[in-house]
Amino acid sequence: MMTYIVFILSTVFVVGFVGFSSKPSPVYGGVGLIVSGGVGCGIIMNFSGSFLGLMVFLIYLGGMMVVFGYTAAMATELYPEVWVSNKVVFGAFVFGLFMEMLLVLYVLKEGSVGIAFEFSNLGDWVVYGVEDSGYFSKEAVGISSLYSYGMWLVVVTGWSLFIAVVVVMEVTRGG
């Protein structure tokens, strides 16, 4: 039962990012990111990472609320463009949903996906098992697992934030 809950949450996670990537207006892009961030926190909490999920929810989504509140105020439109108002945007949204549906059907038929990585033992690295170590709390072990197993995730996230800052500086420069 828990596998299906994680599977449904993962599908909603990807659908939220499909909605974000085909955003026609900044308001709807923010909604897609907030939905995906909340569902991602639910996935983390499902793997008994309650502290990490709560911190991501409070810090990440709290910061996003401020940023998207500011961008929505700066980019207000009288009639914001929705997904169905532009054929190209709607086509990208439908194509993304179709690809996610194909992946879901493939996983339900085959049982696993091993395209670039093998995801069969996902519970082994999401949150460390700390039952044997009585001296460490789950929170400290969770943060250390982020920097040990999730090293490439931290590197990619840092690089993405750097590129985002450069893009924002170029856009605001106006040149």
Swiss-Prot record:
Enzyme Commission numbers on file: 7.1.1.2
Protein's UniProt keywords contain Cytoplasm: no
Chief location of this protein within or outside the cell: mitochondrion
TM helices/strands, residue ranges: 1-21, 27-47, 49-69, 88-108, 149-169
Keywords: Electron transport, Membrane, Mitochondrion, Mitochondrion inner membrane, NAD, Respiratory chain, Translocase, Transmembrane, Transmembrane helix, Transport
Localization: Mitochondrion inner membrane
Keyword Membrane annotated: yes
InterPro entries in UniProt: ComplexI_Subunit6, NADH_UbQ/plastoQ_OxRdtase_su6, Nuo/plastoQ_OxRdtase_6_NuoJ
GO terms for biological process, alphabetical: mitochondrial electron transport, NADH to ubiquinone; mitochondrial respiratory chain complex I assembly
Domain of life: Eukaryota
Stored PANTHER family: NADH UBIQUINONE OXIDOREDUCTASE SUBUNIT ND6, NADH-UBIQUINONE OXIDOREDUCTASE CHAIN 6
Record's function text: Core subunit of the mitochondrial membrane respiratory chain NADH dehydrogenase (Complex I) which catalyzes electron transfer from NADH through the respiratory chain, using ubiquinone as an electron acceptor. Essential for the catalytic activity and assembly of complex I.
Quaternary structure and interacting proteins, as annotated: Core subunit of respiratory chain NADH dehydrogenase (Complex I) which is composed of 45 different subunits.
Official protein name in the record: NADH-ubiquinone oxidoreductase chain 6
Organism: Pteropus scapulatus (Little red flying fox)
